[in-house]
């Protein structure tokens, strides 16, 4: 299924998400919508604090076909606050959830493409700098993750002209750009610039716009 069709399907479903929702029913509606696709959904719980419009965490992973019992799939888990039996979703929250799901699917489809391009080959690990958070730097610095996070920004419809001042892009505008700026802009500028170029490349292919220069302020 094309990613554009997936976006339309998710946005159509999100129109019915506002209000107090029965979680199993919400998951079931998503799985029914994607029953002929490799995407599947489940629900989990979390205990951390959250914002009213960002109260559902979305995690995902791609798994290539292992056997007849474990087919190729993209698994998406929606994490709901443990304190509530039902999901309470605001209008803005429904929009945010739709973007997060679409973004996760974009990300995992990119991993699918990566594996098909070079099966069973892993990328070289990123070596964190002395003052970096080791786990975050190794995760975001991995070449496959950098490419997939850049690719997922298409789901946010990020205006690539804003990359001239990427250091001003907020978490709400693009989580990936925000996290790569926070992790690499000062600690390892080469990775930050490499990421921005990937975002620009994917964004330009989506919008068909002409090339613009990334401002030196991002360096």
Predicted stretch roles:
Residues 32-65:
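Amphipathic, interaction-prone secondary-structure segments
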Residues 99, 115-145:
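Post-HEXXH active-site segment of zinc metalloproteases
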Residues 14-38:
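Zn2+-dependent metallopeptidase catalytic core
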Residues 8, 134-145, 150-219:
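Long, well-structured alpha-helical subdomains associated
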Residues 100-108:
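Short alpha-helical catalytic segment bearing the HExxH-like zincin motif
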Residues 52-99, 112-116:
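Active-site scaffold of zinc-dependent metalloenzymes
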Residues 3-11:
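Acidic/histidine-rich, surface-exposed loop or edge segments in extracytoplasmic proteins
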């Amino acid at each position: 299924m094309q990613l554009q069709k997936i976006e339309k399907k998710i946005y159509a479903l999100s129109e019915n998400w506002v209000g107090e929702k029965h979680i199993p029913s919400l998951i079931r509606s998503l799985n029914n919508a994607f029953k002929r696709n490799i995407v599947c959904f489940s629900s989990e719980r979390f205990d951390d604090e959250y914002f009213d419009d960002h109260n559902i965490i979305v995690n995902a992973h791609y798994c290539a076909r292992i056997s007849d019992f474990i087919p190729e799939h993209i698994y998406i888990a929606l994490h709901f606050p443990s304190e509530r039996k039902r999901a309470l979703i605001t209008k803005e929250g429904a929009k945010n959830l739709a973007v997060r799901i679409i973004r996760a699917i974009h990300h995992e489809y990119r991993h699918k493409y990566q594996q098909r391009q070079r099966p069973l080959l892993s990328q070289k690990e990123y070596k964190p700098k002395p003052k970096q958070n080791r786990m975050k730097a190794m995760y975001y610095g991995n070449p496959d993750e950098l490419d997939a996070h850049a690719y997922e920004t298409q789901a946010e419809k990020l205006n690539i002209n804003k990359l001239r001042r990427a250091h001003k892009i907020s978490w709400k505008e693009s989580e990936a750009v925000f996290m790569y700026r926070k992790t690499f802009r000062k600690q390892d500028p080469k990775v930050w610039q490499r990421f921005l170029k990937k975002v620009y490349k994917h964004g330009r292919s989506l919008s068909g716009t002409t090339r613009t220069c990334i401002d030196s302020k991002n360096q």
